[in-house]
Amino acid sequence: MFKKDSIVAIATPPGKGGIGIIRVSGNLSVKIAKIFLKRLPKEKQAEYIPFYSKNGNTLDQGIALFFKSPKSLTGEDVLEFQAHGSPVALNFLLQEILSIKGMRLAKPGEFLERAFINGKIDLIQAEAISDLINSCSIQAAKSALISIRGYFSKKINNLILSIKKLRMKIEVDIDFSEENFNKISIECIKHDLEKIILNINKIQCSFNRGAILKEGSKIVIIGKPNSGKSSIFNILSGNNNAIVTSIEGTTRDILHEHIYLDNIPLHIYDTAGLRKTDDKIEKIGILRALKEIKTSDHILLIVDSNIDKSNDINLIWPKFNSNIKNKITIIRNKIDLSKEIPEIKIFKKNNIISLSAYTGEGVDILIKYLKDLNCLLLNEEGCILARTRHILEIKKAKNNILNAKKLLNKYNLSDFVSEELRIAQSCLEKILGINNNSNDFLNEIFSNFCIGK
C-alpha cells in the first residue's frame, strides 16, 4: 500500500554538526535526484557528488544515496542527501526541494509510518526504534535493538500461529462431529491451551524485566530502629538526605533516591524502623513502610550485628510474611562493633552481607551484590520494553484463553471456545498492527517520533 504523495525532511537533529541529512521518500525521488544532483545515483551505492539548486548553482558537496522501491526503509523510492551540517545550507536545500510540485514536508514519524504501511516493519519494531532513540542505558539500548531485530514480534507471531492452528482443529471437529468434542479432542485442546497460557506467562515475565530495565528495580531498606538503615541509604544514594542519629525512630517517612548502577536504574527506599510504638506519626511511617515492602522487587533487611547474633530470618523476624522471604537480603551492619569480617554468604536460601556503614568495610560487597542482583533480574530469557498497549492486549488475550479453558472444562462448547480464541488472536494481532490501520491509531503511535524519522 504505497502513498501517492512524496515527502521530505531533515533527518538529523537541529543545530550545527559534522553532517546533515535530508531524506526524500516517494515517487518523486527520481525526479528530485535529476534536478538537484543532475543524475540518479547508482542504487545502494554512496556517491560523492555536488548538490545543486533549481537554477543550477552549486549549494554543497556530499554523499548521495538512492534506494529503489521496495528495497528501502519505507518500501518506496528513497533518496538521501548527506551534506555538511550547516543549518542554513540544509534549510535552503530543503526549501528548494519543497518548491517542487507534489513534494511536502514529512510529519513526525512519517517515514517509519510508511515503512509500516508498506510491510517493511511491524508496530513492535517501529516502537522499538523509538525506545532505542530514547534509551538511557546500554542495557536498554540492547533490549530495544533485540525487538527491532524481531525478537518480540516473533514471540507474538508464534502465539498467533498456535491459536490459528488450534482454531482450525476445533472447527474441523465442529464440521465433522455430530456431537461437540470427543474425549481425545478435549485432552488435545486442553494441552494446547495450557501451552499457549505458558508462553503468554513467559512474555509477561519478560515485560516485568523490561519494566525494571526501563524504570528501575525497587529496593526497599527495612529494619528495626537504629540498625543503620539510613546510613546505608545515604551510602547507596551518595548523599546525606537521611538524618542519622543514635535516637530510635528518627526516620518517620519514606525517603526515595533514583540511582544508576552500571547504567541500570535503581530506586532505593529508606523506611521507618519497624517496631511497636504509641507515637501516631511514627505509626503512619511504619504503615507506609509495610506498603512499600509489598511492592518491592527486593528487600534489604538491616540488622545490628552487635545485637542480633543469628543469621536465621525466622529468629531475627519471627512474624515476617513467608511469601516474601525469597526476596530478602540480610545486611549485618556494625561489624566494626561485633568484630565480624566483611563477607557475603548464604544461610537457608537468604543472602547475608556483613559490613559496616560507619567504617565502609564491606560496602563494596553490597554494591557488587546489587549490580549482580540487577543482572539476575534482567537476564532470565531476555527483557521486552513493553508499551502500555502491549501489556493490555496480552492481558486481554490471556483472559480470553482462560475463558476458553473454563468453557471447555465446564460445558465442552466448541463454538464458544473457538470464539474466545478468535478474540484472543485479534488482541495479539493488534500488538503487531495487523488489521488496525486507522489513521487515529497510527497517528497516536508515530506522532511521538521526530520529523525525519
Curated annotation (Swiss-Prot):
It comes from Wigglesworthia glossinidia brevipalpis. Gene3D superfamilies: P-loop containing nucleotide triphosphate hydrolases (3.40.50.300), Probable tRNA modification gtpase trme, domain 1 (3.30.1360.120), tRNA modification GTPase MnmE domain 2 (1.20.120.430). K(+) binds at residues 226, 245, 247, 250. GO terms for cellular component: cytosol. It is found in: Cytoplasm. (6S)-5-formyl-5,6,7,8-tetrahydrofolate binds at residues 23, 80, 120, 453. Its cofactor is K(+). Homodimer. Heterotetramer of two MnmE and two MnmG subunits. Belongs to the TRAFAC class TrmE-Era-EngA-EngB-Septin-like GTPase superfamily. TrmE GTPase family. It is an enzyme of class 3 (hydrolase). Exhibits a very high intrinsic GTPase hydrolysis rate. Involved in the addition of a carboxymethylaminomethyl (cmnm) group at the wobble position (U34) of certain tRNAs, forming tRNA-cmnm(5)s(2)U34. Pfam families: MMR_HSR1, MnmE_helical, TrmE_N. Transmembrane segments: none annotated. Keywords: Cytoplasm, GTP-binding, Hydrolase, Magnesium, Metal-binding, Nucleotide-binding, Potassium, tRNA processing. One of its GO terms (molecular function) is GTP binding. Its EC number is 3.6.-.-. Mg(2+) binds at residues 230, 251. Its main location: cytoplasm. GO terms for biological process: tRNA methylation; tRNA wobble uridine modification. Residues 216-375 form the TrmE-type G domain. The gene is mnmE. Binds 1 potassium ion per subunit. GTP binds at residues 226-231, 245-251, 270-273. This is tRNA modification GTPase MnmE.
